[in-house]
């Protein structure tokens, strides 16, 4: 799609690109450069170094006055982004992970669809290897032309909807002002809370083309197959997501979601099974068991309020096998599913 630059620029939203970095010295320079190279005049780049012990600080300082840099002790991503947001002034906020890259023209495309009442604009992200070469699938898997109303409906039903990871989201300052700063009751990852709460404060607009390069290098937080305990961590994040949504509902007057909604989500079902099979002592979902997950597999498939698809059937089969197979076979199935990211739910599908 082609845009008239003068028409887009007349809208004049300003951008704040906030980069929280911790020990990604080999990547953070690329992230900063991709932000500075955006063909949008009204932008600021804010870099928060969260106590790095590698060469990150020297890399950041090389950009001089082109970036607004802060160097703090290590407190985690949530606190780094709290600081970054407090120092920002843009109408639109992007929390760019320090190992990711904004594709040229990203700000212009985001600005072209920006309008009042939007809580976030989300874009597709292209996976790359550690050197930035495209590999694997584009995320999220989502039907072209999906509407904000469809996303909102799914979020209200399942506390979940198709969303890219952090760098693929451009947030309304008006929305973030209502929820920031995020305190310790929220998840340590900023994405968890912002993504969960956004549908309750405004429209979510999707640009169905990749505008971010998502670097995969083995240390990514989203690489669940890196460690067995990661699945239990993700299940625990479901609590934080539920808490965030409850806060949003109290603030906006929406009905409070019930705890049982956590057992009606097909993606969380897979994480629950992986958590209970691999690290059962760290599984932290009260009332959960493999027996319950077995029954939930059928309930989700048979009684889901969204149209069933081929992937839903495959998820049912995978879930049953991952529950009943001997430990070593179940572990292989879990690793195969999450390391290759097969059975990623096709949501909001035709």
Please identify what each model-predicted range represents.
Residues 2-230, 349:
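Nucleotide-sugar donor-binding/catalytic module of glycosyltransferases
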Residues 157, 188, 213-350:
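C-terminal subregions of glycosyltransferases and related glycan-biosynthesis enzymes
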